[in-house]
Amino acid sequence: TIADRQAEQAMRDILTERLPEHAILGEESGMSGTNGDWLWVLDPIDGTRAFLTGRPTFGTLISLFHKGRPVLGLIDQPVTGERWIGVSERPTQFLSDRLPGTIGTRPCPNAAEAELSCTAPEIMTAAHAPRFANLQKHTRRTSWGGDCYAYGLLALGQIDVIAECTMNPWDWGALVPVVEGAGGRITDWQGQSLTLESDGTVLACGDATLLPELVRHLS
């Protein structure tokens, strides 16, 4: 959309002016710069369908990668005034003037008790759909349509598990520090850390001890 392109360009202009030595990767305009160590990854409107239909589950995602791994992430929901800020190896911050919330994932040691979330069933490819369906069978129930906002809710202890595929670095980069700084884990479906070379699958859980069981159900 025009809003996507204009928002990304505004962010690019600020970063280029203040940090000209850093590279930038955005959903709308691709890669600029060649610095191999520091890379800003931008998604001005994650959840375009939600944005276009007036549902406040979209958000702006900004992340900073260092040597291929995300070390800083921001999820911003401008309608509700909520913002999550994650920095590697530090507690996630939640900022909100209107809505209450305390950062911290909740215990959920068994998949059978877990609330599962995914943006939409149609994001599943033919190869991934049966694996996701198997995970569904082993969880309590599934909710749809959260986009990046679901990961913020996981960091607040409202959701237990999120499993998605066909994700790009601008979709998940900001989510990693936010989820991990709240006490959760976020990996690919094999349980491996997410990098720029990852396969597009994303698995997040609030209770880190649940990860091996989830990976088994998705295998």
Q: What function would you assign to each model-found segment?
A:
Residues 104-219:
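An extended, acidic
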Residues 34-93:
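DPxDG-like acidic metal-binding loop motif
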Residues 4, 15, 48, 77, ...:
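Residue-level signal for inorganic ion chemistry
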Residues 5, 28, 44-47, 78, ...:
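Generic detector of well-ordered alpha-helical packing
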Residues 65-69, 79, 88-91, 97-98, ...:
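Short loop segments at secondary-structure junctions
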Residues 2, 6, 52-55, 145:
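Residues at secondary-structure transition points
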Residues 1-45:
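N-terminal subdomain of lithium-sensitive/metallo-dependent phosphomonoesterases centered on the IMPase/IPPase/PAP
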